[in-house]
């Protein structure tokens, strides 16, 4: 046989054997164990290699598929486990260079032509060689082969191939780069490495890195590149450049090329044969032929930033700053923008500008972050070489302004941060192009502009040259320009920045700046305002600057130096006399039909200045007694009517009237400022002692009326504009928002002086401007903006709103009027008839509706019911044909209004409003709904109505409703309406919307009946009427007549069921309580018995199974639970023979029903786990069923059946962990009842199942759910109060349980990743077991097993959520041992501290300051650190036991804390804990630590101990003085 197989070698070499047969023979020889060829692996590999080499050298002709199969054959050998095992066992397999060369040739062919012929197989072979160290040596030994391969691979990738080849290609590139990096590390000839990288690898790798950075292959899709691999390859390329181009050995060459040329002193160094490395790199970089023209600009730009970063990483250190700078101009010269001349901005596209400016930003940031630019050193030693370069960059940026690009602003910001003198010569152009004349609209660009302006102002504030800066700003503003095209000078960003800067300035600089603006205004603008629109716009810009300066200066006060006060007072007087009054004089006495633009802007300007002056004047007068206002004293003066405060001093009232008429022609900034002036006047009036005089009150009313009336027209336009809150941004478009904001912000002042018409108008505006539809998506930059909707919504939810009684009442009226108008619009009859039938819809005065209670009330003592005319009227309308029908659009409108009503405090309404709202809401709820209303919309509407009725009836005035309507009549009206409406609902019974609706209806009806009981309102009468109504209702009569189920209304049946159930739920407990106090009325007991029978009949009808797969409806489960509770309650309560027999018969008559539901619930319990209410109701039923032995089936044990059903719930893998945790308390209540009533044998069954589940073999079988369910059952069991034989049975099993938990935890912790679904519950139940104390676990060995569990649980490499879940559980176990096992702790303190130290060190590791990443995980670490601090306090409380170990605990802490830099909050908590341990250390312990700690640790301990003495011990010593 061996002879046959040995002939294979000859057949492979034979020319007569077909290639098909050769390949089959070769494959067979490789896989067969009976083929005894000498050195078989080498022979077969050489045969395939020789065949391919012969083919590619044209010595052999082969078909294409044969070539492909030969490559695949080599690939199979290279990737086979057999070959790997042979190599691992030391066998040598030689790859010939000829194979490697043809691989390189094929890759080169692919890179040049893009031909993918055989390329996948070739790449697989290459990957097989490179991934096997024993084979890869052929590449690593021949560096030129690796360089050639890597170069061609990168060029291949640069062609941007697609399809399956992508992943394979980049896998090989990743491997090749890894090997080449190892070669570079071992390279002893830096010149060779530099030459290889720059000549062969620099260009393709730069292009490849650019493409990878742009995400060319990382989009989702088949054959695409993984992001992790992309990031790794980019990192490898950077490492290759660092190791090849920027080697430490080349530093002298870089110095020769960069520094010596500059100094004219050419020196020869050790590397003199290597010519200018920087020139070599840059020439290769800017060469135009290595990539497409469309890519060249961006490749060069991105590469410039990379090369400079790598240069700094390699060579930057103290003393090399000049060298690192000299590279910068050379690299900057590679960018296109460096060669731009004047007026050549358009030579580059926007995308090119963006790319290159981003690179310039990176370069400048590198300079700033590494402190390369030292101003003094540059000036003294280097003749301002750096300064001149930065000036060149600054001129380039200023001359080619690119305001739409955020990076342009950031570059300028960095330049001014380096040295303000860089931009000082172009300061005016900078301010013009970056601020005054810049057109900035995009959010990111606004933020960049804001940061630049902030830096400019902060810089000049530090230099105390803000007046100089403002001189430049004023110069730019006053330049001739098309002002209408300019953006507002103080939009939100610049205004915020300027305000923050001005607040920090000393008063003298503020006053200098103020004076400067005033002078410029007077000299350059004021004389030329007449009929000049541009000048008028300039005046507005200067007014805004003045407003910002005056509003953001520090207020004068009693501590302000007198010269500053006097100068400020002079400035105020000068401004009024020389600026405000002349500007006011420019406004016409008689306004024309349409005011000119210049007049509008002048009026805006002067009114802004007037408002500013008045506001600042009032502030100075209030805060500084040395300031004497031109307006006279502000407070404490009793004024005559003729001397009431004016708007401005020196301006007559008649002149203001003319100004009012003029500004009334247009809504703009001037109108807003005039309103502010009137508001300021009101405040001044209120500060007088005579503000309550008739004249003062009349003046206040007139002023308030003016403020409200001036914007009435604009508010009616319903604008959707948004306002940033800055005065300068008030315009015709944003004025309504600013006006409404002014009113709402000052309503506390205005509301007392408004007439009823104005109050009603404000209420209507508030309602009209509230958002009633879906919230629209808002862009990031508009989030902080103010809109009408935001203002109104905030005011509606404000606690001040209900306090403004007049406005609140008017708003309530508006809402009911709007609701009533929509309802009346759906009237199907004559409006006169409807007004007679539903008069409250047409009554706008709540008081009239509220007084109906007097009209309908009986004469008699409190508690006697009134007549029910309203209810009877409503009932007749509901039964016959309700006169109102709403369609879809009307319903949507009403839903919006209901949303508004839900925001009101319905529980605090006064009786008149309460009654009116109740009637309106009830009318809505019983209204007919048209065909255009979908079932979902109708359900949403009804649910909302009854929710609001429920909220209303929880209020303080709920009793007032029962003065005009019987409770039973309300019940009947509601259900009659709902029974009729339910027939049109095309909706599934288990639809969440329907179930929510049933819940809301049930809650409303139950609260209604509870209120009847609380108020003791004719209980027998009301409940008899309710019971009679339900028994005569259509759904009940249909059910009783046993008609065909499909012809009946299932929704109506469920409504009836909910009503009966809630009736049982109310009457049952009430009668039970009555039994305790006094004899329960027999009539109510009879009614309850009747209701129970009715409920049982309906339930039996509803519980008839339908089609296959039928499930219990959730409503039925809760209803049957209530029925059983009522049945059992009657059974236990009734003492009389007759009633007792009747209740027995009732209970027995429902046995089949209860048993059927019981069986169905046991089957469905796992499915119900995801529905909280249904699951609770099911468990409640099972609890009640378990407590009624007469209902138990005779065949099976109820305990066993229920227990196995609960086990199925816990063991169901489809139930999420969170759901299991949520239902655990409910299961615990059932379990407690079961074990309390159950026998010892029942408990033994439970214990047996728990121990089976805790068997470690379940982990080996990967049956995690069985383990988790057993642990959960054990936790439930431990929470049950057991005694006697049951308790001893549990404690006897504790050792076995602890051992099982130890094994389970060990298995779960060894899995990768750690099985936290097992570890977490195991720790929980272990803590619960340990908390039972030494009576339960008496053997110290079993407690010590807990320490082994704690040490086994891994705390490394956990996600933040996982860490936050595991850590507290570990802490709980430790705490349980410390608190509950004092005897064990006497000998186990080292084990305890070992486990505790793990927790401390893990907190240090997680709480260290990381180089990158957010601090989102910090709250989790802080919680864990607090637990550590608490444990330290518990240890310190046991001083006698732990005193000996305290120095070792401190030493461990110091040892670990020196390894990390902690977040301050984490460090503070840990230090507070270790201070408590230091309290236990005596002086010899401290001396021991100082002597034994290593030097580095000694310093940390010294600092720690000093802080301890300073902050902790001193504080506690101080406290002891006051301790008795």
UniProtKB/Swiss-Prot annotation:
GO CC term (a single one): aggresome
Any GO BP: regulation of signal transduction by p53 class mediator
Keywords, ordered alphabetically: Nucleus
Nucleus as UniProt keyword: yes
Compartments reported by the entry: Nucleus, Nucleolus
One of the Pfam families matching this protein, by short name: Urb2
Main location: nucleus
Highest taxon in the source lineage: Eukaryota
PANTHER family: UNHEALTHY RIBOSOME BIOGENESIS PROTEIN 2 HOMOLOG
Function according to Swiss-Prot or TrEMBL: Essential for hematopietic stem cell development through the regulation of p53/TP53 pathway.
Record's protein name: Unhealthy ribosome biogenesis protein 2 homolog
Organism: Homo sapiens (Human)
Gene: URB2
């Amino acid at each position: 046989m061996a002879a046959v197989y040995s002939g294979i070698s000859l057949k492979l070499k034979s020319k007569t054997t077909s290639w098909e047969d050769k390949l089959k023979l070769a494959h067979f020889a490789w896989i067969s164990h009976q083929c005894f060829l000498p050195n078989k692996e080498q022979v077969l590999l050489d045969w395939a290699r020789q065949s391919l080499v012969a083919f590619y050298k044209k010595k052999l002709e082969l078909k294409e598929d044969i070539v492909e199969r030969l490559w695949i054959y080599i690939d199979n050998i290279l990737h086979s486990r057999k070959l790997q095992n042979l190599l691992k066992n030391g066998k040598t397999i030689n790859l010939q260079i000829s194979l490697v060369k043809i691989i390189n040739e094929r890759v080169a062919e692919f890179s040049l032509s893009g031909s993918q012929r055989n390329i996948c197989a070739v790449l697989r072979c290459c990957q097989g060689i490179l991934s096997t160290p024993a084979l890869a040596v052929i590449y690593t030994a021949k560096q030129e082969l690796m360089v050639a391969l890597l170069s061609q691979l990168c060029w291949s990738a640069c062609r941007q191939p697609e399809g399956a080849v992508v992943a394979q290609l980049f896998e090989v590139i990743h491997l090749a780069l890894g090997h080449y990096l190892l070669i570079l590390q071992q390279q002893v000839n830096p010149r060779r490495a530099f030459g290889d990288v720059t000549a062969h690898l620099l260009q393709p790798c730069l292009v490849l890195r650019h493409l990878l950075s742009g995400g060319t292959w990382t989009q989702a899709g088949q054959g695409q590149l993984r992001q992790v691999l992309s990031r790794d390859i980019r990192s490898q390329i950077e490492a290759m450049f660092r190791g090849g181009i920027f080697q430490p050995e080349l530093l002298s060459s870089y110095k020769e090329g960069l520094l010596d040329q500059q100094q004219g002193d050419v020196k020869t160094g050790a590397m003199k044969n290597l010519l200018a490395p920087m020139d070599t790199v840059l020439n290769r970089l800017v060469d135009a032929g290595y990539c497409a023209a469309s890519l060249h600009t961006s490749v060069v730009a991105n590469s410039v930033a990379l090369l400079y970063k790598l240069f700094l990483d390699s060579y930057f250190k103290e003393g090399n700053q000049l060298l690192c700078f000299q590279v910068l101009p050379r690299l900057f010269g590679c960018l296109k923008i460096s060669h731009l001349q004047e007026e050549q901005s358009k030579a580059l596209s926007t995308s090119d500008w963006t790319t290159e400016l981003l690179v310039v930003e990176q370069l400048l940031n590198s300079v700033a972050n590494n402190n390369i630019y030292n101003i003094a050193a540059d000036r003294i030693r280097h003749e301002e070489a750096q300064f001149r370069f930065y000036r060149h960059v600054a001129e380039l940026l200023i001359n080619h302004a690119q305001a739409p690009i955020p990076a342009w602003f950031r570059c300028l910001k960095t330049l001014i941060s380096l040295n303000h003198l860089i931009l000082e010569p172009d300061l005016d152009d900078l301010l013009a192009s970056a601020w005054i004349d810049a057109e900035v609209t995009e959010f990111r660009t606004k933020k960049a502009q804001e940061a630049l302006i902030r830096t400019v102002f902060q810089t000049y504030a530090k230099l105390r040259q803000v007046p100089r800066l403002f001189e430049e700003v004023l110069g730019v503003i006053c330049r001739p320009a098309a002002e209408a095209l300019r953006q507002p000078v103080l939009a939100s960003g610049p205004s915020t920045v300027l305000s923050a800067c001005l607040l920090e300035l000393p008063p003298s600089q503020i006053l200098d700046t103020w004076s400067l603006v005033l002078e410029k205004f007077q000299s350059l603008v004021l004389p030329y305002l007449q009929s000049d629109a541009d000048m008028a716009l300039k005046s507005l810009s200067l007014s805004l600057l003045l407003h910002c300066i005056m509003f953001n200066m520090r207020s004068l006060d009693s501590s302000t130096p007198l010269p500053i006060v006097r100068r400020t007072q002079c400035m105020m007087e000068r401004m009024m006399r020389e600026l405000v009054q002349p500007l006011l004089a420019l406004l016409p006495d008689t306004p024309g039909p349409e005011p000119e633009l210049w007049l509008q802007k002048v009026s805006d300007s002067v009114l802004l200045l007037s408002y500013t002056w008045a506001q600042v004047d009032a502030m100075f007068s209030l805060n500084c007694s040395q300031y004497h206002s031109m307006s006279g004293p502000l407070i404490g003066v009793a004024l005559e009517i003729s001397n009431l405060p004016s708007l401005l001093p020196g301006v007559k009232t008649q002149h203001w009237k003319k100004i009012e008429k003029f500004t009334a022609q247009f809504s703009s900034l001037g109108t807003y400022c005039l309103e502010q002036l009137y508001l300021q006047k009101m405040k001044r009036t209120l500060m007088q002692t005579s503000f309550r005089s008739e004249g003062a009150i009349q003046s206040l009313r007139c002023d308030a009326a003016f403020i409200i009336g001036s914007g009435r027209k604009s508010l009616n336009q319903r604008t959707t504009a948004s306002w940033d809150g800055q005065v300068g941004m008030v315009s015709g478009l944003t004025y309504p928002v600013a006006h409404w904001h002014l009113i709402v912000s000052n309503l506390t002042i205005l509301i007392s002086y408004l007439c009823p018409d104005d109050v009603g108008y404000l209420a209507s505006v508030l309602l009209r401007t509230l958002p009633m539809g879906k919230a629209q998506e808002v862009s990031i930059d508009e989030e902080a903006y103010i809109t009408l909707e935001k203002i109104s919504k905030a005011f509606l939810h404000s606690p001040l709103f209900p306090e403004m009684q007049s406005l609140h009442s008017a708003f309530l009226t508006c809402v009911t009027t709007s609701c009533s108008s929509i309802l009346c619009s759906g009237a199907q009859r004559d409006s006169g008839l409807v007004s007679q039938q539903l008069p409250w819809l047409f009554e706008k005065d709540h008081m009239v509706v509220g007084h109906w209670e007097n009209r309908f009330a009986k004469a008699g003592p409190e508690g006697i019911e009134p007549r029910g005319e309203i209810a009877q009227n409503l009932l007749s309308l509901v039964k016959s044909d309700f006169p109102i029908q709403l369609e879809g659009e009307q319903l949507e409108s009403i839903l919006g209004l209901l949303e508004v009503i839900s925001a009101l405090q319905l529980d605090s309404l006064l009786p008149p409003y309460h009654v009116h709202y109740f009637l309106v809401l009830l009318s809505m709820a019983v209204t007919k709904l048209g065909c255009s209303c979908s079932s979902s919309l109708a359900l949403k509407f009804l649910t909302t109505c009854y929710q609001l009725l429920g909220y209303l009836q929880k209020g303080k005035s709920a009793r007032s409703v029962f003065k005009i309507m019987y409770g039973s009549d309300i019940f009947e009206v509601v259900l009659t309406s709902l029974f009729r409406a339910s027939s049109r609902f095309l909706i599934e019974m288990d639809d969440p919307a329907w179930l929510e609706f049933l819940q809301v209806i049930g809650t409303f009806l139950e609260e209604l009946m509870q209120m009847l009981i609380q108020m003791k309102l004719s209980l027998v009468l009301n409940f008899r009427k309710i019971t009679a109504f339900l028994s005569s209702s259509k759904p009940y009569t249909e059910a009783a007549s046993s008609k065909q189920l499909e012809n009946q209304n299932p929704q109506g049946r469920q409504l009836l069921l909910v009503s009966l159930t809630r009736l049982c739920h109310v009457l049952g407990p009430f009668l039970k309580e009555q039994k305790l106090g006094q004899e329960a009325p027999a009539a109510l007991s009879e009614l309850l018995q009747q209701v129970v029978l009715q409920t049982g009949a309906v339930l039996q009808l509803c519980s008839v199974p339908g089609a296959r797969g039928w499930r219990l409806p959730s409503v039925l489960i809760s209803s049957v639970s209530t029925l059983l509770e009522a049945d059992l309650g009657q059974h236990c309560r009734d003492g009389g023979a007759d009633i007792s027999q009747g209740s027995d018969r009732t209970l027995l008559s429902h046995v089949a029903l209860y048993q059927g539901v019981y069986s169905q619930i046991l089957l469905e319990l796992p499915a119900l786990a995801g529905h909280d209410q249904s699951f609770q109701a099911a468990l409640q039923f099972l609890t009640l069923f378990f407590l009624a032995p007469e209902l138990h089936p005779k065949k099976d044990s109820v305990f066993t059946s229920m227990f196995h059903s609960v086990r199925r719930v816990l063991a169901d893998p489809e139930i999420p962990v969170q759901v299991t945790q949520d239902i655990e308390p409910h299961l615990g209540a059932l379990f407690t009842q079961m074990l309390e009533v159950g026998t010892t044998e029942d408990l033994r069954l439970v214990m047996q199942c728990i121990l089976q589940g805790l068997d470690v073999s379940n982990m080996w079988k990967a049956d995690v759910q069985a383990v988790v369910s057993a642990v959960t059952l054990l936790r439930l069991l431990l929470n049950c109060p057991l005694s006697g034989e049951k308790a001893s049975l549990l404690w006897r099993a504790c050792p076995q349980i602890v051992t099982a938990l130890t094994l389970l935890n060990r298995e779960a912790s060894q899995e990768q990743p750690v099985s936290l679904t097992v570890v977490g519950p195991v720790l929980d139940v272990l803590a619960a077991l340990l908390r039972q104390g030494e009576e339960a676990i008496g053997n110290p060995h079993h407690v010590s097993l807990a320490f082994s569990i704690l040490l086994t649980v891994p705390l490394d490499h956990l996600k933040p959520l996982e860490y936050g879940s595991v850590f507290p559980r570990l802490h709980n176990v430790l705490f349980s041992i410390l608190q509950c096992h004092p005897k064990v702790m006497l000998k186990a303190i080292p084990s305890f501290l070992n486990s505790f130290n793990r927790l401390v060190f893990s907190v240090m590791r997680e709480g260290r300051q990381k180089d990158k990443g957010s601090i989102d995980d910090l709250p989790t670490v802080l919680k864990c650190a607090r637990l550590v601090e608490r444990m330290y306090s518990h240890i310190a409380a046991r001083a006698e036991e732990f005193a000996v170990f305290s120095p070792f605990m401190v030493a461990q802490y110091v040892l670990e804390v020196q390894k990390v830099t902690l977040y301050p909050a984490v460090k503070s908590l840990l230090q507070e804990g270790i201070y408590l341990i230091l309290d236990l250390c005596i002086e010899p312990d401290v001396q021991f630590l100082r002597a034994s700690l290593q030097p580095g640790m000694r310093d940390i301990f010294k600092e720690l101990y000093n802080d301890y003495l300073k902050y902790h011990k001193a504080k506690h010593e101080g406290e002891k003085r006051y301790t008795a």
